[in-house]
Amino acid sequence: MARSIEDAATGALAGSAVGDALGGAAEGNTPAVIQERYDGTIEGIVPPFHADWRTARPIAPYHKGDGHVTDDTLMTGLLVDVYAEVRRHLTAHDVADHLVPRMIGEVRWIPELEAEALPLQRVFLAEKWLVTRLHYGHVDPREAGVGNVVNCGATMYVAPIGLVNAGDPAGAYAEAIDVAGAHQSSYGREAAGVFAAAVAAAAAPDATVTDVVDASLALAKDGTRAAIEAVVEAASSLDGWRGDGLAVLRDAVRPFDTVGDAYRQPAMDARL
């Protein structure tokens, strides 16, 4: 039986929050280090990677782990709130007019801070860029993402764009590319578009994994498309990611990854 759009939306948003809460504890660490820390893969709620989380990384004194969601879920919720307010499709201008004001003006519970605070006080530098450029710099929202760290910062919260465009991957891609222009550029912006398209394809009645992959490949450009193709080809020979699966997938994506295997030690070609 086909899923309803309500079920698809609930599953996407709740699932992303649960995944965020499970993975947040180990974010930024390699699979080998994660498995050493937790005596295997993460199968449920785990404590912080660093027991002394307040001081282990002073630049990010967040209580990751123990089931706490991160800024991924916070930003996703803010985007849902924007849709609830405007009741229409979004553009980059809506990021300036509706999303940023929420980041700097709406106090809410921030689990990782163990306090009520502004979302601005939890998001990291690539998301603070939104406030700097749009609220203080008055930059054209359609171009504000240029110069920011090119990363997954926009991708992490565009699932609602895919849901609003359920069954229309091309529409989701176009809307996410526009919205993400206020935050990201280059392959960071492209990733947001392709991810939203994948969610839109997955939200269609009776959607299959093949449908999602095909929709993503039909819209992805340049290195993003090549990377997806490489990973899909590698994954087709696997029964799952456990065992040697992670290494096979990592080998497939490595040629396209300018960051390098160690997340906080960029490769020589990391500069744009």
Protein language model annotation of sequence segments:
Residues 1-272:
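Structured, active/binding-site neighborhoods that engage oxygen-rich ligands
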